From Swiss-Prot:
One of the GO BP terms on file: regulation of DNA-templated transcription
Protein family membership: Belongs to the RpoE family.
Protein name: Probable DNA-directed RNA polymerase subunit delta
Gene field: rpoE
Domain HTH HARE-type: 14-81
Keywords from the UniProt entry: DNA-directed RNA polymerase, Nucleotidyltransferase, Transcription, Transferase
Subunit structure: RNAP is composed of a core of 2 alpha, a beta and a beta' subunits. The core is associated with a delta subunit and one of several sigma factors.
Entry-linked InterPro entries: Asxl_HARE-HTH (IPR007759), RNAP_delta_N_dom_sf (IPR038087), RpoE (IPR029757)
Amino acid sequence: MGLADFKDVDRNELSMIEVAHAILEDRGERMAFADIVNEVQKYLNKSDEEIRQRLPQFYTDMNTDGRFISMGENVWALRTWFKFEAVDEEVDHPEDDGDEESTRKHHKKVNTFLATTEGDDVIDYENDDPEDEDLSDDSDADEDDADDNSGDDYDDNEDDDDDDSLLDGIEDQLSQMDDDDLDDDEDEE
């Protein structure tokens, strides 16, 4: 089936995917996607704007249609041109073309924490917190203070005595109910 089969068909009724299949069949060779689109546009007499609007769907159709096969680098062919077993061999794998060292050099990650310059720009993780020195100086003083105090620092709260003698607060304003008061309330009902 090629473009000759469409001579009696209204071109407005043809889909881009059908025309692309016929073009590849007539050519009998692989084609770049851009060339396929240009040939389809010429055959269907579509404007650039109309092709641009339909291009995403057309590309999706080529990917999902089982009659087409991507050869890599946006080059397309018909699946019927290849034996089933040969399909994997015909697909171009760009990662297999070069040696592995060049691929690794290309994908080498940069460690931003390794600095090659000397000076203030280099981060010293062993001595990065200026407060560490202050804490170590304070801890020596705290040890000396601990020797002077024989008791626990936590039990030296002087505010404990104030808990028993509360000032006139809300507690004094609350009334307390006795069991007799509860019995009186039940009798009234």
